[in-house]
């Protein structure tokens, strides 16, 4: 499908033919949900931990004799039912990551790109370069493009001045094309791709 290209200043810069197999699919929410869940689970630290009966600092002596007191039978005070006792079936340090087939991840990325194109939330620019790393100048450019909450995907390397200027803008993320992912695409209102990023994505899914 034909798509207009613009410059950072909002001027017309021609057009590009987008591959329907990447940008023209009917988005599937189930694939997007699976991929986002996989990404967030993989990112989770999993450092939660509580102490078991073998780990807490408490005596293992029997609280009182077995018979004759009229009270219930108990062993050590480290049992979970007592104040200061251990935790039963508590969290342990573990990885929350789970597997997701590579083909499913690739398909989910294409559906995420298609979702932005379908919602008219996709912008293609010729390049993202600045002469200096001034945030004020970049903010003016984004104002012309109507960008306040966006993910910007550059080529294999992001221009240093552009990255420095965008770093100070809230709700603006900048990634090289090899770092593009479903979660970051969906969490921002707009997706901005450079011409180099479009070419790289089409080569990747060829």
From Swiss-Prot:
UniProt KW rRNA-binding keyword: yes
Single GO term (MF): structural constituent of ribosome
Gene Ontology CC terms, in alphabetical order: ribonucleoprotein complex; ribosome
Region spans: Disordered: 49-79
Any one GO BP annotation for this protein: translation
InterPro entries, per database record: Ribosomal_uL4, Ribosomal_uL4-like, Ribosomal_uL4_dom_sf
Cystine bridges: none
Keyword RNA-binding assigned: yes
Keywords: Ribonucleoprotein, Ribosomal protein, RNA-binding, rRNA-binding
Highest taxon of source: Bacteria
Family matches, as Pfam families: Ribosomal_L4
SUPFAM superfamilies documented for this protein: Ribosomal protein L4
Cross-referenced Gene3D superfamilies: 3.40.1370.10
Role: One of the primary rRNA binding proteins, this protein initially binds near the 5'-end of the 23S rRNA. It is important during the early stages of 50S assembly. It makes multiple contacts with different domains of the 23S rRNA in the assembled 50S subunit and ribosome. Forms part of the polypeptide exit tunnel.
Self-association state and partner proteins as the record states: Part of the 50S ribosomal subunit.
Family statement: Belongs to the universal ribosomal protein uL4 family.
Protein name: Large ribosomal subunit protein uL4
Species name: Methylobacterium nodulans (strain LMG 21967 / CNCM I-2342 / ORS 2060)
Gene designation per UniProt: rplD
């Amino acid at each position: 499908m034909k798509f207009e290209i613009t410059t950072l200043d909002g001027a017309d810069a021609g057009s590009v033919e987008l591959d329907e197999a990447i940008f023209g699919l009917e988005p599937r929410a189930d694939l997007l949900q699976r991929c986002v869940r996989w990404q967030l689970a993989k990112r989770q630290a999993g450092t939660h931990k509580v102490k078991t009966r073998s780990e807490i600092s408490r005596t293992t002596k029997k609280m009182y004799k077995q018979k004759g007191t009229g009270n219930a039978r108990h062993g050590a005070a480290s049992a979970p039912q007592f104040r200061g006792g251990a935790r039963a079936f508590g969290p342990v340090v573990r990885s929350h990551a789970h597997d997701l087939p590579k083909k499913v991840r690739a398909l989910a990325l294409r559906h995420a790109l298609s979702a932005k194109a379908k919602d008219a939330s996709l912008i293609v620019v010729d390049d993202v370069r600045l002469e200096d790393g001034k945030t004020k100048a970049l903010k003016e450019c984004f104002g012309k493009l109507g960008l306040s909450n966006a993910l910007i995907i550059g080529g294999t390397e992001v221009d240093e001045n552009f990255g420095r200027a965008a770093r100070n803008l809230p709700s603006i993320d900048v990634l090289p094309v090899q770092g593009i992912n479903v979660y970051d695409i969906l969490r921002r209102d707009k997706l901005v791709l450079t011409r180099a990023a479009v070419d790289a994505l089409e080569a990747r899914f060829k």
